């Protein structure tokens, strides 16, 4: 009888221990305005390929458990194409609130890096829209005061690396302020590798020879645009932002292609030839189109250090890089400036 009681008592202890064991999963929960029933994608550091999970939003709310082994950087990508960084560690209870239309003002509780970035954005953008100089000053102060925070890598990337004309000396100076543990993170390693590539094709540098298969299968070469200013326009059929930018470029192309010795070469990141061709036809894009069907591994993506879509690089007839990631207004101003020099 004593053996039976002992066995029952031991089993009860085991069940109690199991019941008290804290889950090491991350619990994500949130309320998002402007998202009744939608989908949010969760990506790892390589947000082009490394999808971690899919979050289904119902009536603006969601709850999701995510399994992680250590502190990780991730990305929330919303249905409108907007994205926002997220930091998760084992057993974190993370609450997200705000509007999917304004991810820069999301409030994220749980994990110090999330809360630090939330405070930074709310203090900076919570009231009036700050000037570019004010944003850069605040971003620099954040990095210097948070040398151990994963959020500092994002701030460096967003507000310094992604500028149309990055200040490489400033970026290197700020990266040196970061703790060694941050420099070993994959996100930071990728960022430094990108900077090395970008510096070789920054404004003022010369673009090397390139070619890309056209819609008819024949190669399109840089020499096909002799004596013309060429806008390399990186896009993809699956990006709504790209399709909208293409529509805006059509009017510019119509006005400038003959008068300013200006041309456009569309460089698609599609991987399906028929889908790519259908998009070109449906959007009635008149300029030449090239695609090697390799997505983000496309040769010109690496050659010109492209990380976002839509994106553009303006080349002079000599091959000199005149501008990167220009707005339509900046393209028009650059062409007007060039015309005055003739």
Language model regions located:
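A non-transmembrane, solvent-exposed segment enriched in polar/low-complexity residues
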Residues: 18-142
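N-terminal "domain-start" segment that seeds a small globular fold
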Residues: 189-222, 287, 334-341
